[in-house]
Amino acid sequence: MAPALSPTRSHHVAVIGAGPAGLVAARELRREGHSVVVFEKQKQVGGTWIYTDEVESDPLSVDPTRSVVHSSVYRSLRINGTRECTGYRDFPFVVRSGVSRDPRRFPSHGEVLAYLKDFAKEFGIEEMVRFETEVVKVSPAAEEGIGKWRIESTEKEKKVRRDEIYDAVVVCNGHYVEPRLAQIPGISSWPGKEMHSHNYRIPEPFRDKVVVLIGNSSSAEDISRDIARVAKEVHVACRSNPADTFIKQTGYNNLWTHSMIESVHEDGSVVYQNGKTISVDIIMHCTGYKYHFPFLDTNGIVTVDDNRVGPLYKDVFPPAFAPWLSFIGIPWQVLPFPMFELQSKWIAGVLSGRIPLPSKEDMMIEIKTFYSTLEVQGIPKRYTHRMGNTQFEYYNWLASQCGCSETEEWRKEMCLANGVRKEAHPETYRDEWDDHHLVSEAYQDFSLYS
């Protein structure tokens, strides 16, 4: 066991990002008695949930000199998980009155942003936030003592650069900014337009076009249907589909699902593994994102290798820097907000000395064992942080560390049922459901916090 910190000791902690992870991190750290400064590049809280019509100058978002747009939200986006499962555990995402509020069970991105602002207001988070302040560099400040961190930041308006020392840093900068792209044979000579879904906002630019989307994510499903309203043809290609896949989507006369692209050619054609050849105007990569920490300088100790952030104990602490450096929100295929809350409680309690960590050696042994297990199971490195149905074991482990209750059974059942419904009825799952008994259980729990 690592030496325990002084019980209930207060530390000066920097939180990077005022999105849904950073907001709840700030609350939990302050609740535990720490002093907190939150660094946020934008003018308001909300992170990726702040919608903007603006897109990047490079539609693929690979040009390092581009002006980066943080949000990946498109105008028609509605959440793909239920309202009940989406909210923080002790601040339910319930319907609120107001002319601009969205009362639907699967509301729009604007309703999520409004909820996050409600949360920030309720817990006085904004007083801890430095808005329009970008973190330029985070590095160990060994000369200042064990666990100290130097943060260099710039304020947009004042053009002031600060150099400050903190006891600990919690990284909450999200991972929906730096796109991953599919590797397509022949793409360098293909004459059409390529883009990433990060830069998709509205369907109108695709009117009368033949469009290919690559990916099987929720964004690929939603955007393909959004575009199909105006496009000439929409084709969705997916690596996980069998090679002979060619399916016309029910309810559409211009939307097909294919196997993966085999190659593209100078004449504008796209050849699929199923043997189909189609002349295409636009290829959109709906292929996810890379973890990206451009400000973090750990001298190679914390790395991103094929989308594995490591080494991280329980997806949060790099052993060499624990507990003074931590990450919130690394796992995916999860219930994000409740997970952020539990990770935040754990970090806050570890920093105060209330919750012990294993020794650095024991943490590294567990990490290496986990990596070996993934390798034996044939799981690619890029899926290291994918959880899916194992997420609930993780939440309950976090809860056990923090001394709080495990994930509610209704939340687990609702999440799993929604996944089944989404798979079976992708067109209607947001507006038709049959889990009213679980909704009732959820609202009985919510009454404890009203």
Swiss-Prot record:
UniProt keyword annotations, A-Z: FAD, Flavoprotein, Monooxygenase, NADP, Oxidoreductase
InterPro entries in alphabetical order: FAD/NAD-bd_sf, Flavin_mOase, Flavin_mOase-like, FMO-like
Top-level enzyme category: oxidoreductase
Residues involved in NADP(+) binding: G215, N216, S217, S218, S219, A220
A Pfam family hit: FMO-like
GO molecular function: flavin adenine dinucleotide binding; N,N-dimethylaniline monooxygenase activity; NADP binding
Cofactors (names): FAD
This enzyme's EC code(s): 1.8.-.-
Binding site for FAD: G17, A18, G19, P20, A21, G22
Entry similarity comment: Belongs to the FMO family.
Role description: Catalyzes the conversion of methylthioalkyl glucosinolates of any chain length into methylsulfinylalkyl glucosinolates.
Name of this protein: Flavin-containing monooxygenase FMO GS-OX-like 3
UniProt source species: Arabidopsis thaliana (Mouse-ear cress)
